[in-house]
Amino acid sequence: MPKKGVEPVRREQLIRATFQTIDEIGMADATVATIAKKAGLSSGIVAHYFGDKDGLLNAAMRQILRELKEAVARYRADAGDDPRDQLRAIVDGNFDDSQINGTAMRVWLTFWAASMHQPELARLQRANDQRLFSNLCHQFNRLLPHPQARLAARGLAAMIDGLWLRGSLVGGQFNAEKSRRIAYGYIDFQLQAAAL
């Protein structure tokens, strides 16, 4: 009989090993055996906890989505109630170190690519997109008419994704500060245009 409390530890080991494997060789070349070996566990443990490689990728994506949600929540809690500050906090959470380190970026790129072919990952991606849009729209709605708020939210969501994607593909160190400044400029432009 397994020791009490071992399952969460093993699951975490396997998820972290999945991140490392994606970082080192990519998901296409990864096998359950490769990931299990990286975690120092048997392939049978992967099957026991996750079923197969897709189940493990699903769990890994849930983990990185959870980390994103926590980062955004942390920045928002520190930002105060002003809508502009809340919008900036959402931007900051998306460019948090947990989301822009090399491993996280490769995991996100793998997730986005796989979500085009795996319905469960596509569902997770849609939920993530909807959460971002909803959070942005709520804050813009506090200062802009609803149709304009929706448009501004869509634009900022696309800008966040675009800045992140371009930053991930250029190689080298991701310039989070530059990306933040560009996104902040978009927020300021939208809010100033509404004031005219």
Curated annotation (Swiss-Prot):
Q: Name one Pfam family in it.
A: TetR_C_6
GO MF annotations in UniProt:
DNA-binding transcription factor activity; transcription cis-regulatory region binding
Q: Which residues cross the membrane?
A: none
Start and end residues of each HTH tetR-type domain: 8-68
InterPro entries, per the entry: BetI_C (IPR039538), Homeodomain-like_sf (IPR009057), HTH-type_TetR-like_transc_reg (IPR050109), HTH_TetR (IPR001647), Tet_transcr_reg_TetR-rel_C_sf (IPR036271), Tscrpt_rep_BetI (IPR017757)
The biological process GO terms on file are:
glycine betaine biosynthetic process from choline; negative regulation of DNA-templated transcription
Q: What protein is this chain from? A: HTH-type transcriptional regulator BetI
